[in-house]
Curated annotation (Swiss-Prot):
GO terms for biological process: L-lysine catabolic process; putrescine catabolic process. 4-aminobutanal can spontaneously cyclize to 1-pyrroline, and 5-aminopentanal to 1-piperideine. The gene is patD. It comes from the Bacteria. Pathway: Amine and polyamine degradation; putrescine degradation; 4-aminobutanoate from 4-aminobutanal: step 1/1; Amino-acid degradation. Homotetramer. This is Gamma-aminobutyraldehyde dehydrogenase. One of its GO terms (molecular function) is NAD binding. CDD domains: ALDH_ABALDH-YdcW. It catalyses: 4-aminobutanal + NAD(+) + H2O = 4-aminobutanoate + NADH + 2 H(+); 5-aminopentanal + NAD(+) + H2O = 5-aminopentanoate + NADH + 2 H(+). Its EC number is 1.2.1.19, 1.2.1.-. Keywords: NAD, Oxidoreductase. InterPro entries: Ald_DH/histidinol_DH, Ald_DH_C, Ald_DH_CS_GLU, Ald_DH_N, Aldehyde_DH_dom, Aminobutyraldehyde_DH, PatD. It comes from Escherichia coli O157:H7.
Length: 474
């Protein structure tokens, strides 16, 4: 397994403290990797800053060609990446290979095309004798912090738009799941000029803080927890850096009496438990109208009970383990607190799986109330709650009564209601009669404590640029 850092076009061993990297399906240590030292963090940022002088002036065509080459080598090494992701994250191998690798490749190919379509406003005369032009230019060095739930996917979401816009990047994957990012570094070093992409390894305190606080870093992009986002915003405030935050969610799933119940059950069985629920957009907070509440709970409980947890390399496995022992304990604690309320009923699951690995049973909880912690707080595991509601006004208020604002869905056959409710929901994305679907052409990002800024789409590309005005007197 590739375990070296990429700094200024060279693969080098970390000079800091060694950290274990685990296989969550067994609890065994896969390997130990040395963190980047403070000096190596500084070297990576300075390499990116030096490379920006030339990379920032390249044509969109040149940047697009590099991104397309990177997409091709990821596709060619898809099985290798999927196996690394499966071993390091516990993802079912077939899901990593069939779902995630093609989407990752598409992200790089989309931004390769988008790079050639990013334009400023056409020239115009707004003052006599002067011509004004609007430019969209790269910012410089971007520090990108990727999470542990989709290590390679989130690295792609951050690298592709930043590079397409002409920035240079220092990427720090999570210390829990670094293996695919380090493998990506090995392949990228022969495609991009030295210093354009740098990849480090280490914890937030030892590597993340000196990286995000570095004076030559002009932008920090994070996908992570609210607590981490708060820390980075505070940490970078003295240097007034641009920040781009995707900080989690608690997606409301509003099911009206006229919804197609079979479609809801099929959708939540898939979209509520994908990646063992370790996804900020999962369908985890169901609001079911009183006319279909009992039927939905019964049918969904039966469906969730058929989900198979197992070894990641088993083709029949639908749910792998959680990412770490610490996270398993957090998920377990959240469910135990829900049970202790007395009014929440465990329909299925509700316990750790016996044996090795960090497995938690797919869980459905019914009878949850609006103010319950299981409704208000992100669990980030295979846990879905169901809350009964009376009418449209009530459920819209409840759905919006959340610190999160990332994703939501509405299930109804009434087109007017679908439009009406979607317009009132305070979420970055609202799906109607589906959930969880993402495409490279459409933006992904939240409101409120879910953060700000967009991933994917032309809006995502614009987030990695600065708008400039050039005026010429003639």
């Amino acid at each position: 397994m590739q375990h070296k850092l990429l700094i200024n076009g060279e693969l080098v061993s970390g000079e800091g403290e060694k950290q274990p990297v685990y296989n969550p399906a067994t609890g065994d240590v896969l390997l130990e990797i040395a963190e980047a030292s403070a000096e190596q963090v500084d070297a990576a940022v300075r390499a990116a800053d030096a490379a920006f002088a030339e990379w920032g002036q390249t044509t969109p065509k040149v940047r697009a060609e590099c991104l397309l080459k990177l997409a091709d080598v990821i596709e060619e090494n898809g099985q290798v990446f999927a196996e690394l992701e499966s071993r390091n994250c516990g993802k079912p191998l077939h899901s990593a290979f069939n779902d995630e690798i093609p989407a990752i490749v598409d992200v790089f190919r989309f931004f390769a095309g988008a790079a050639r379509c990013l334009n400023g406003l056409a020239a115009g005369e707004y003052l006599e004798g002067h011509t004004s032009m609007i430019r969209r230019d790269p910012l410089g060095v971007v520090a990108s912090i990727a999470p542990w739930n989709y290590p390679l996917m989130m690295a792609a979401w951050k690298l592709a738009p930043a590079l397409a816009a002409g920035n240079c990047v220092v990427l720090k994957p999570s210390e829990i799941t670094p293996l695919t990012a380090l493998k990506l570094a090995e392949l990228a070093k022969d495609i991009f000029p030295a210093g354009v992409i740098n990849v480090l390894f280490g914890r937030g305190k030892t590597v993340g803080d000196p990286l995000t606080g570095h004076p030559k870093v002009r932008m920090v992009s994070l996908t992570g927890s609210i607590a981490t986002g708060e820390h980075i915003i505070s940490h970078t405030a003295p240097s007034i850096k641009r920040t781009h935050m995707e900080l989690g969610g608690k997606a409301p799933v509003i099911v009206f009496d006229d919804a197609d119940i079979e479609a809801v059950v099929e959708g939540v069985r898939t979209f509520g438990y994908y990646n063992a629920g370790q996804d900020c957009t999962v369908a985890c907070r169901i609001y079911a109208q009183k006319g279909i509440y009992d039927t939905l709970v019964e049918k969904l409980g039966a469906a969730v009970a058929t989900l198979k947890s197992g070894a990641p390399d088993d083709e029949s496995t639908e749910l792998g383990p959680l990412s770490s022992l610490a996270h398993l304990e957090r998920v377990s604690k959240a469910v135990e607190e829900a049970k202790a309320t007395g009014h929440i009923k465990v329909i299925t699951g509700g316990e750790k799986r016996k044996g090795n690995g960090y497995y938690y049973a797919p869980t459905l909880l019914a009878g949850a109330l609006q103010d319950d912690a299981i409704v208000q707080k992100e669990v980030f595991g295979p846990v879905v709650s169901v809350t009964l509601f009376d009418n449209e006004e009530q459920v819209v208020n409840w759905a919006n009564d959340s610190q999160y604002g990332l994703a939501s869905s509405v299930w109804t056959k009434d087109v007017g209601r679908a439009h009406r409710v979607s317009a009132r929901l305070q979420y970055g994305c609202t799906w109607v009669n589906t959930h969880f679907m993402l495409v490279s052409e459409m933006p992904h990002g939240g409101q409120k404590l879910s953060g700000y800024g967009k991933d994917m789409s032309l809006y995502g590309l614009e987030d990695y640029t600065v708008v400039r005005h050039v005026m010429v007197k003639h």
